[in-house]
Amino acid sequence: MTDPLPIVPFTRPARATVRLPGSKSITNRAMLLAALSGGSTTLQGALFSEDTAIMAEALRRLGFAVTEDEARATIRVDGSGGAIRAASAELFVGLAGTAARFLTAFCCLAPRGRFALDGVEQMRRRPMKSLLDALEALGASIQSSGGFFPLVIDARGLRGGEVSLDATESSQLLSALLMVAPLASGPVSIRLTDPGYRREYVTMTLRMMEQFGQPPARISADGLLVQPPHGTPYRGAGALYPVEPDASAASYFLALPVVTRGTIELPGLSGPSLQGDAAFADRLARVGARVSTTPAGTTCSFDRGAARAQALRDDFHAISDTFLTLAAVAPLLEGETHISGIAHTRKQETDRVSAMVAELRRLGQDVHEEPDAITIRPRPLRADVAIETYGDHRFAMSFGILGCHDLRGDGTPWLAIRHPKVCAKTFPGFFTALEQARLDSTASS
């Protein structure tokens, strides 16, 4: 793959079927829940990417048998009821936020052992302190670098009690604590210090815990007190655990017809979904796309002869992984796009708000930045720009979709993506799938 990678525009309306990879969020949660359970669980339709490989390798280092079959998209985990067999381990979490937070809490469950965890430089800047404080309040012994990675855990199990947690910077901090709480020595109550956490991902975690045998958690009406179940062992969710297609990855291909006109079909993306990002389809319907979901999958269409899609003003807090998708295609929308509720994305793989503003301005757009929002006023797109990706997979994929617009009208590339292999974090085959969609669309016209 060349770097920068020129994006070849579509010269015909999109007409293609794209098979999405499995959900990263579900795959990594399911691997941990399978390890917490007794017996073997096989994930069907699992994601194979850097983030899931990191989780699988970490579980192996902790003594679990993990068998991967990428050709069949299956991952088998032989659980042990949460017992960590290794007396010590060094775990590398890369830039995988799910693995980083979930494994930290998991290692604290062990009655004894020493576990060292570290990641790449970007991971060393991502929020961890609130989770570490909560785990220490439950009896964990953790050495950290001022509340950040690297970490050393001297395991001695977790006791019960009430802890405070700020999950506004990342709901993964709360999800990590929820999944291990049933195996603490006493009941755990979690008091949230701020209601502004992403409840959709927490709901996913709680629903998956129920699928693996836990009773429902008790949640106060204001959402600020969560009491996970206690005393019930996890059990396998069945011989096969189906993993949904990734709804965040779907956002790129759902947006493609808005850029190129035409129709994209996404088999297997059907409701109801565990993933909050499935709601991105509703946003596309509001800009003028036709989105239909059946038990077989989801189809998104935008008429070639229709006027430009309409801009949107909306709060993306609940589906913030998809805000980059809308922002990247906003130059092609009619009117001013305003996206709010995204302050927490400043502490993800990069400062996603400032980085998005910078790249749109390089493309000639009028962009206003606020602490929690951006406003995009379309201007003529500037050609021959190589998009910086900031080590962030979602920048590569979002702007890859914008590059499918035939800006010059002759099918020649006008936009390139620097470091396109960053997509390996969650969707290694993204650019291959995008190019195949272009070829299929050309052939069917």
Language-model features: where?
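Short, structured segments at the rim of ligand-binding sites
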Residues: 1-445
